[in-house]
Amino acid sequence: MRNDIADPEGPPRKGRLREEGMAALTLGALGVVFGDIGTSPIYAFREALGQAAEDGIVAGEILGVLSLALWALILVVTCKYVLFLMRADNNGEGGVLALMTLAQRSTRRRRTLVMALGAIGAALFYGDGVITPALSVLSAVEGLKTIPGLEHSVSRGEILLITSAILIGLFLMQARGTRIVGRLFGPVCLVWFVTIGGIGLIHIADQPAILAALLPHNGVLFMANHGVAGMFVMGAVFLTVTGAEALTADMGHFGAKPIRTGWLAIVFPALALNYLGQGAFALHRLEVASARGVEFVNQDWFFLMAPGLARIPLVILATCATVIASQAVITGAYSLTRQAIQLGLLPRLKIRQTSEHAAGQIYLPTITMLLFVGVMVLVLGFGSSSAMAAAYGVSVSGTMVVTTCLAFLVVRRSWGWGWPLTVAVIVPLLLLDLFFFGANILRIYEGGWVPLIVAGGVGLLIVTWVRGRKLLLAIDQSQAIELEELARMLRARPPERVPGMAIFLSSGMEAAPSALLHNLKHNKILHERNLALTINTVNQPAVPAAQRLDMTNIDENFTRAVLNYGFMESPDIPRDLAFALRHGDNKLEPMQTSYFIGRSTLRPSKHSGMPFWQDLLFIFLYRNASDPTDFFRIPPNRVVELGSQTTI
């Protein structure tokens, strides 16, 4: 949503392609959507080949590993995401929470299960969000060790120092926003994809036999011959598709067609050429090692493909690309957090708009700090991208399993698919996801526990917040009085009246707001006009201006109002009320309007619906939630807070 009152909806989503142009949107998608998966060649093939080469390697195994990588891209990204999941959008928005709300709309009996799946997917995303910046930037900076003359002069400590400096700069930049520098993301990534594709093509020309890796039977033979060891290789192969979930998560920003075009026309060809080039280069080195009678050594194939001093600009370009990929993940974490807050999965956090014109340009200080601490702990704790790579796939593969489960509910309930078609499409995709998830679970002891710990922590917060809010709402409802009943009582015994308009924020649509009851109890006054206002989040990304406000007149003293928001929107009560009430007798006069907010002081109870420790955790979250005045953008000098004490 834009910040001007004249057009709170922003440009229509369907007209965006015509307004901005396919080329511009596709270029923008290169920097935001494909940054993560586009930088995987730096480390993915190296890690997969390293797993395969632990007991020696032959040419057929190089072809097998490469075949697995290429067909992972084809099956997971192209078939599952591009051809299937990108059709499952919620009014143009994608991602695990958008899919969750779409599934909730299509089923009534399984809403709790659907919310649980969405919460698990969101929690796993945060595990991914901590690892991506650490792994990608560190892997790019490690390319310095491949530059002639620096192989032995650059120490591990210096690599970590440079990586830390880049990441510190990246996180410091978040408070200022990325609107200006963000314009460079697309062009830089276009140069990146052209460069890595071109380098790969050169080595393919030297070793055309590597094209045999395009035949899937090489991958099948590799898995058949390697048993459990092959599963460890598959866990590393999965690194080639990490970041695929961004294709659906960013549909709301660019549209499905530009993302599909970017993948099929630019990104996939560039990635395939680069992986084939790395395989060709490794095959050449294997032949040289065999001819000399020396042992084959797994190396940084990505950087070593470039000749000599050409690695200097390649390292610089790789660092820029990984910073862009990291920025996309950070922005994704902001967007997901806002959705989770709006859907009631997380407490309110301070959200700051960093652009007057782009609703997606937001900054969350709490999320920034938590991500920064997590990223720096990983960089300094693991010390190398190879050590960290094992931690990467678990959360992403888990998210993919959740996504497919939600997609099952959508195609059955929302799209109306029959069982034969549903089974024919969903079962193979789910088996593929479970196969990759199982391969990554094997690597838990190598670092895969890290994202699970992060996801488990976030999941605990979500469960505690949702359960605590339900308990608090039940307590409020048990003590509540209906607004209509209160209005009748006040007509019989009217209190003293004061001029102006009072807006009472309420969590329920039928009950009288607690702030109104406390105002009558302690101040014994009633304003000329009184509005009981409820904020309602609907299961769609955005709400048109015509559907923003629902109003019901109770009597001449009271009006019940509901402000409707989509899960991708940030509430702005004064702006949206002013726009909706710009005509007629209910016109909002800012300087004659007071906002009354009820705030409870919570006390734990050993007899509530949650364990005592969870009561304490919920109270901590409740106390540290963003002030509703800031979150709803209400002028502080127009707010009256009335408190009460509640035992949960």
Curated annotation (Swiss-Prot):
- Transmembrane intervals: 25-45, 57-77, 113-133, 153-173, 184-204, 219-239, 263-283, 312-332, 362-382, 391-411, 417-437, 446-466
Places the protein is found = Cell inner membrane
Q: What is its main location?
A: membrane
InterPro entries attached here? K+_transporter (IPR003855), K_trans_C (IPR053952), K_trans_N (IPR053951), Kup (IPR023051)
Q: Which Pfam families match?
A: K_trans, K_trans_C
**Record's bilayer topology term:** Multi-pass membrane protein
Alphabetically, the GO molecular function entries are: potassium ion transmembrane transporter activity; symporter activity
- Write the record's keywords in alphabetical order, separated by commas: Cell inner membrane, Cell membrane, Ion transport, Membrane, Potassium, Potassium transport, Symport, Transmembrane, Transmembrane helix, Transport
Keyword match Ribosomal protein: no
Catalysed reaction, written as an equation: K(+)(in) + H(+)(in) = K(+)(out) + H(+)(out)
Superkingdom classification of source: Bacteria
Q: GO cellular-component terms in the record?
A: plasma membrane
The question of whether Membrane is a record keyword is answered with yes
* Role: Transport of potassium into the cell. Likely operates as a K(+):H(+) symporter.
Question: What's the family?
Answer: Belongs to the HAK/KUP transporter (TC 2.A.72) family.
Instruction: Report what the protein is called.
Output: Probable potassium transport system protein Kup 1
